[in-house]
Amino acid sequence: MILNNKGFIRILEATIAGIMVILVFSYLVMSQNFDYNLSLEFIGYNALYSAHIEEGDFENISSLYKKIELPSNVGYGFEIYKNGNLIYSDAKNGVVVERNFIFENNTSVNFYKLRLILWWR
């Protein structure tokens, strides 16, 4: 079947327009500055503030690992400070997310800082 000249030109124009649209959108996507550390911060803050952490969890580190739920492709470690003194650290280099805790009982007030260090696996 022989295409007439007008039909062939319309098909050619549509093909070229489609290729141009693909190239423009590809350029726009590739020119974005993706900050993967920003997504790690979001994941970390979400995990820290959604976990119900009690004072006893700071003495039993394995319970912290159970309470803080993160995706399987995110590695993490902790630094724990009690009243300003470092009491536990197993962290590597990565994105740091912090949360402060204050626990009081009848005899004392304890200040904890939990630093969650995250990295991509």
From Swiss-Prot:
Signal peptide: 1-31
Keywords tagged on the record: Signal
Family that this chain belongs to: To B.burgdorferi BB0465 N-terminal region.
Full protein name: Uncharacterized protein MJ1284
Provenance organism: Methanocaldococcus jannaschii (strain ATCC 43067 / DSM 2661 / JAL-1 / JCM 10045 / NBRC 100440) (Methanococcus jannaschii)
Highest classification ranks of the organism: Archaea, Methanobacteriati, Methanobacteriota, Methanomada group, Methanococci
